[in-house]
């Protein structure tokens, strides 16, 4: 009898803790699968922008007439600053031109129409054939569109840990390296100009060049960009 009561107690205790975790993750919503916003989730860590922004597109059911894509530099462009455009900023860290077409197609599907404008920020690193391989876009889309996705996250330890981090950032108003608000606008910690100058001066040319030691120009780079354009004949392209 005592053993049976122990098992019941242990089982109920686990349910209690799992319920608390689920409620907290739902309240914080670190992967943007729900729509509630409040002061406690006002800053969201950019842990996986591909998944988070795909989730936002999939679950929010909004329509846009322009799509913005690019690397981490482009994430800091405020999508609300474009005049006469309703833009969704779908840029993310280490974006590679070869994967952009699949993200555009996913965005068009959620948008339920073609984009009038597709804006792409390109940089030199995108021409590197030997760039690190990113997560397969199909894996991202399959994960986000899984019927159980948003509910699995409620019991995810990673989502729980991320929720705690987001709570800290929101309460302390410290975005860290990069955080987003609930409107998909990115923020970062502002450094004193003298500190920035000091860091730049301390960075050697050799250190910067070492990042390109495996660089090889992708001979198909132009073809990749041409495919993006030909796949979207109803869109006007703005490239910078």
Stretches with model-predicted labels:
Residues 8-29:
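Hydrophobic membrane-insertion alpha-helices, especially the h-region
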Residues 42-48, 93-97, 214-217:
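Short, flexible loop segments at the rims of nucleotide/cofactor-binding pockets, characterized by
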Residues 118, 237-239:
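Hydrophobic/aromatic residues located in beta-strands of well-ordered beta-sheets
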Residues 28-51:
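Alpha-helical transmembrane signal-anchor/signal-peptide segments
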Residues 44-68:
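Short extracytoplasmic
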Residues 49-55, 100-109, 223:
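Short alpha-helical segments and helix-capping/turn motifs at coil-helix boundaries
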Residues 65-154:
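Membrane-embedded segments
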Residues 122, 131-236:
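Secreted/periplasmic serine-hydrolase-like ester/acetyl group-modifying domain
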């Amino acid at each position: 009898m005592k053993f049976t009561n122990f098992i019941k107690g242990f089982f109920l205790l686990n349910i209690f803790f799992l319920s608390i975790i689920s409620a907290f993750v739902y309240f914080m919503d670190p992967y943007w699968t729900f729509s509630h916003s409040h002061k406690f989730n006002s800053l969201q860590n950019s842990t996986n922008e591909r998944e988070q922004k795909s989730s936002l597109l999939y679950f929010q059911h909004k329509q846009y007439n322009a799509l913005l894509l690019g690397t981490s530099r482009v994430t800091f462009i405020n999508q609300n600053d474009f005049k006469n455009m309703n833009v969704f900023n779908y840029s993310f860290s280490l974006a590679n031109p070869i994967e952009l077409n699949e993200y555009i197609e996913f965005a068009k599907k959620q948008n339920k129409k073609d984009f009038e404008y597709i804006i792409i920020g390109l940089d030199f690193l995108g021409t590197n054939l030997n760039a690190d391989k990113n997560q397969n876009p199909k894996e991202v889309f399959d994960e986000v569109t899984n019927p159980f996705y948003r509910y699995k996250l409620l019991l995810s330890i990673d989502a729980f840990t991320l929720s705690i981090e987001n709570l800290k950032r929101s309460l302390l108003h410290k975005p860290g390296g990069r955080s987003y608000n609930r409107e998909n606008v990115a923020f970062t910690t502002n450094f004193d100009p003298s500190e920035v100058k000091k860091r730049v001066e301390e960075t050697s040319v050799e250190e910067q060049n070492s990042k390109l030691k495996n660089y090889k120009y992708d001979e198909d780079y132009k073809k990749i960009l041409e495919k993006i354009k030909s796949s979207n004949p109803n869109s006007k392209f703005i490239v910078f």
